[in-house]
From Swiss-Prot:
UniProt entry keywords in alphabetical sequence: Heme biosynthesis, Ion transport, Iron, Iron storage, Iron transport, Mitochondrion, Oxidoreductase, Transit peptide, Transport
Subunit relationships: Monomer. Forms a 24-mer complex made up of 8 copies of a trimeric subcomplex. Increments in mitochondrial iron uptake induce stepwise assembly of species ranging from trimers to 24-mers. Interacts with ISU1 with a 1 to 1 stoichiometry; the interaction is direct. Interacts with YHB1, SDH1, SDH2, AIM45 and CIR1.
Miscellaneous note of the record: Present with 1560 molecules/cell in log phase SD medium.
Location in the cell: Mitochondrion matrix
Protein name: Frataxin homolog, mitochondrial
Lineage: Eukaryota, Fungi, Dikarya, Ascomycota, Saccharomycotina
GO cellular component, one term: mitochondrial intermembrane space
SUPFAM superfamilies tied to this protein: Frataxin/Nqo15-like
Record's catalysed reaction(s): 4 Fe(2+) + O2 + 4 H(+) = 4 Fe(3+) + 2 H2O
Family as reported in the entry's similarity comment: Belongs to the frataxin family.
Functional note: Promotes the biosynthesis of heme as well as the assembly and repair of iron-sulfur clusters by delivering Fe(2+) to proteins involved in these pathways. Plays a role in the protection against iron-catalyzed oxidative stress through its ability to catalyze the oxidation of Fe(2+) to Fe(3+). Can store large amounts of the metal in the form of a ferrihydrite mineral by oligomerization. May be involved in regulation of the mitochondrial electron transport chain.
Database matches in InterPro entries: Frataxin, Frataxin/CyaY, Frataxin/CyaY_sf, Frataxin_CS
Length: 174
């Protein structure tokens, strides 16, 4: 059943002695691209679509997110992480038992909160996103939308999640 469904999405064609894959999905036009055989003699598609037009819950991704230039992504993400680091370091100085360690290196921030665990906030340049791994709220991905890092899954803002969870940790330690 699954194999049949996949076969209906992608089929291999032989045109003038060369192998090509016809790739089509979700209403987009079919594209011809060279097919390659891997070591297990399976045909694989060499075409990869970089962006999708809908989120994981089926909502349409705003054009602002899809058309974000990579340079602007890096500038905005680096600025956000630098400002976040400054804010968290101030909180760490005021509440050293609650937030003993905050580090930022090469686009990856780690935040240690003994009451909850370790947070990882990192850049994902291929997706132009910032990812959060939180011991409380779990993993989430954020896109730059209207100047804020927002989850397209549920509309939450990265700043709001971090503020809420850090405030919980501080109130728990007092």
């Amino acid at each position: 059943m699954i194999k049949r469904s996949l076969a209906s999405l992608v089929r291999v064609s032989s045109v003038m002695g060369r192998r090509y894959m016809i790739a089509a999905a979700g209403g987009e036009r079919a594209r011809f691209c060279p097919a390659v055989t891997n070591k297990k003699n399976h045909t694989v598609n060499t075409f990869q679509k970089r962006f999708v037009e809908s989120s994981t819950d089926g909502q349409v991704v705003p054009q602002e997110v899809l058309n974000l230039p990579l340079e602007k992504y890096h500038e905005e993400a680096d600025d956000y992480l630098d400002h976040l680091l400054d804010s968290l370091e101030e909180l760490s100085e005021a509440h050293p038992d609650c937030i003993p360690d905050v580090e930022l290196s090469h686009g990856v921030m780690t935040l240690e909160i003994p009451a909850f665990g370790t947070y990882v906030i990192n850049k994902q340049p291929p997706n132009k996103q910032i990812w959060l791994a939180s011991p409380l709220s779990g993993p989430n991905r954020f896109d730059l939308l209207n100047g804020e890092w927002v989850s397209l899954r549920n509309g939450t803002k990265l700043t709001d999640i971090l503020t809420e969870e850090v405030e919980k940790a501080i109130s728990k330690s007092q």
